């Protein structure tokens, strides 16, 4: 038989061993999870910027447009742009993000309404240029 003092000492060693094991496992798990961002985190970081893209005739056939449709992006089809059917069929679940505008005034009205972080537009294809007040509705205007 084991004496009471020996049992108490075994319990203490067991408790200390268990605590040490838990601390070591916690440290390993913490370092493993924080070593590199996961794919989901990278996607969230990439998506964190909302965009509004004015699709004109010159850029309607570029692959970049199709890739942006899956992110937090609204596609505004400028007057004369014929890519509506192709963009909507590329991703039926994101078809609601493709908006066809009949006038340039309606394009700028949509940009003002959506207030996205970034506006992507090919300024050389905009007949009267980007209106001066658009900078108050978006944080960044990028010429593509």
From Swiss-Prot:
Alphabetized UniProt keyword annotations: Membrane, Peroxisome, Peroxisome biogenesis, Transmembrane, Transmembrane helix
Top-rank taxon: Eukaryota
Subcellular location: Peroxisome membrane
Pfam families: Peroxin-22
Keyword Transmembrane helix: yes
Residues spanning the membrane: 13-35
Protein name: Peroxisome assembly protein 22
Coiled-coil parts of chain: none
Membrane topology designation: Single-pass membrane protein
Record flagged with keyword Transmembrane: yes
Major location (coarse): membrane
Its biological purpose: Involved in peroxisome biogenesis.
GO CC, any one term: peroxisomal membrane
Gene3D superfamilies for this protein: Peroxisome assembly protein 22
Gene Ontology BP term (one): peroxisome organization
Protein family: Belongs to the peroxin-22 family.
């Amino acid at each position: 038989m084991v004496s009471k003092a020996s049992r108490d000492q075994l319990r203490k060693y067991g408790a200390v061993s268990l605590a040490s094991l838990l601390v070591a496992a916690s440290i390993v798990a913490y370092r493993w999870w924080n070593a590199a961002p996961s794919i989901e985190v990278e996607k969230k970081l990439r998506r964190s910027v909302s965009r509004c893209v004015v699709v004109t005739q010159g850029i309607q056939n570029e692959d970049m447009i199709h890739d942006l449709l899956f992110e937090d992006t609204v596609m505004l089809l400028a007057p004369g742009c014929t890519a509506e059917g192709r963009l909507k069929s590329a991703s039926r679940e994101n078809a609601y993000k493709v908006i066809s505008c009949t006038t340039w005034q309606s394009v700028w009205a949509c940009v003002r309404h959506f207030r996205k972080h970034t506006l992507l537009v090919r300024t050389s294809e905009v007949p009267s240029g980007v209106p001066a007040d658009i900078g108050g509705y978006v944080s960044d205007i990028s010429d593509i």
